[in-house]
Amino acid sequence: MAKDIKFSSDARAAMVRGVDTLADTVKVTLGPKGRNVVLEKAFGSPLITNDGVTIAKEIELEDHFENMGAKLVSEVASKTNDIAGDGTTTATVLTQAIVREGLKNVTAGANPIGIRRGIEAAVAAAVEELKVIAQPVANKEAIAQVAAVSSRSEKVGEYISEAMERVGNDGVITIEESRGMETELEVVEGMQFDRGYLSQYMVTDNEKMVADLENPYILVTDKKISNIQDILPLLEEVLKTSRPLLIIADDVAGEALPTLVLNKIRGTFNVVAVKAPGFGDRRKAMLEDIAVLTGATVITEDLGLELKDATMESLGQASKVTVDKDSTVIVEGAGSAEAIANRVNLIKSQLETTTSEFDREKLQERLAKLSGGVAVIKVGAATETALKEMKLRIEDALNATRAAVEEGIVAGGGTALVNVIAKVAELDLEGDDATGRNIVLRALEEPVRQIAYNAGYEGSVIIDKLKNSPVGTGFNAANGEWVDMVESGIIDPVKVTRSALQNAASVASLILTTEAVVADKPEQKAPAAPATDPGMMGY
């Protein structure tokens, strides 16, 4: 296919038009008085949202060169969302500001490479100062404030803070659609995996069809149990203790399953068998997780162990296990705190190195199950459109809250970015490097300017007053008052603010240093054939 090529100022100008189109669409959502954007969907009702990355992903421009600019900004939003989970609109606004100011200087003859060096130095200084002024998130109230600011709902803030308190900061918190109108929180304590009993005759409660095992022993193996003789000595030892037994194995089949069921029905022995969760290497890892949590040893050939080698010391323990037809929940495993902590650290290190989104999700699930449990926020709303919008807001709030716990918080509403301006201005740079620094100084004001504009105020007036106010004092655009932002609960996670600035500067620098852009030439459509006269065809 033939290519269309633009050079230097023409190339940059075309891309900047795309940047402006996308940024102008996204930035109307910024701040407490931000508006919504309605997105047409191919099927079903339109989506109404104020989520920056969701809007950015939907924008596709007809002009190829403009579309490249728009896609680069969309990448900024996506990258910020991946790293911090929020701050996508701020990142978009910062990108537009850096590109706009940078383009003026490049057009006037400044060297783009020098400008990029200055931008990088200024951003590094700003990030360091953000870390200096950051405050740790120390309690449940602070967590609730972060979530409430991000979701624009105090109720959502309470749900998220309670969920994190119940399942821990590393715990899994999932967001599902509720069947009712109300949003509610449900917490599953302990480790849960999606495998149920192998026979319904193993239940202890015939009405609820669940098996409740109090203070059970737990056998963990990746082997298939088909011959009862393999585990008979172990069963006899467990029988002497009068305690129930949970068997987690690759499968229990052949004569072994009916023998276990028969003993259960006769009341000789309370035993429940379930299949091991996961598949392949992931199954081995999950079995090891269960073993660490319960203090068991996995009976596996990898350790040179056979089923006949299993002893009472090989078994794990827990205060309670509940098994239904689809899932198993292990509560308060008897594994040592040190072993669990080491396992958690191992999974965290794997999380840092993995590049697969699927692997990352599964590792986070394993981490949460070891850390204490799973919380589910069930989102309810009057209509499907409202439900989708609410779900997106809660996802943003959850991500922002995790980021706040990780790196701390700063004054929200763009205030922290203005607070670091003085430190960035101290950078001793010359020539085009100094120009790059000045571009960042101007861009750092832009989020506050846009928040003020969306709320109906003059941004320049707000900026001037903010620069002369104590650090942490800012403008509450929701009611027009000047307040201590942190005390008033208007806060942003450092990770969100930092990621937005770093990603914006990175992509903006790429656009400013672009000298040629290559795009596919649009195909010329052939003219439609003229209609044929039926009389000419013998009719």
From Swiss-Prot:
Reaction catalysed by this enzyme: ATP + H2O + a folded polypeptide = ADP + phosphate + an unfolded polypeptide
GO MF: ATP binding; ATP-dependent protein folding chaperone; isomerase activity; unfolded protein binding
E.C. no: 5.6.1.7
Record-linked InterPro entries: Chaperonin_Cpn60_CS, Cpn60/GroEL, Cpn60/GroEL/TCP-1, GroEL-like_apical_dom_sf, GROEL-like_equatorial_sf, TCP-1-like_intermed_sf
Ranges in a coiled coil: none
Class in the EC hierarchy, top level: isomerase
Keyword check for Protein transport: no
Signal peptide location: none
Pfam family, any one: Cpn60_TCP1
Keywords for this protein: ATP-binding, Chaperone, Cytoplasm, Isomerase, Nucleotide-binding
SUPFAM superfamilies the UniProt entry points to: GroEL apical domain-like, GroEL equatorial domain-like, GroEL-intermediate domain like
Location in or out of the cell: Cytoplasm
Function: Together with its co-chaperonin GroES, plays an essential role in assisting protein folding. The GroEL-GroES system forms a nano-cage that allows encapsulation of the non-native substrate proteins and provides a physical environment optimized to promote and accelerate protein folding.
Subunit structure: Forms a cylinder of 14 subunits composed of two heptameric rings stacked back-to-back. Interacts with the co-chaperonin GroES.
Protein name: Chaperonin GroEL
Source species of the chain: Streptococcus thermophilus (strain ATCC BAA-250 / LMG 18311)
Lineage: Bacteria, Bacillati, Bacillota, Bacilli, Lactobacillales
Gene, per the UniProt record: groEL
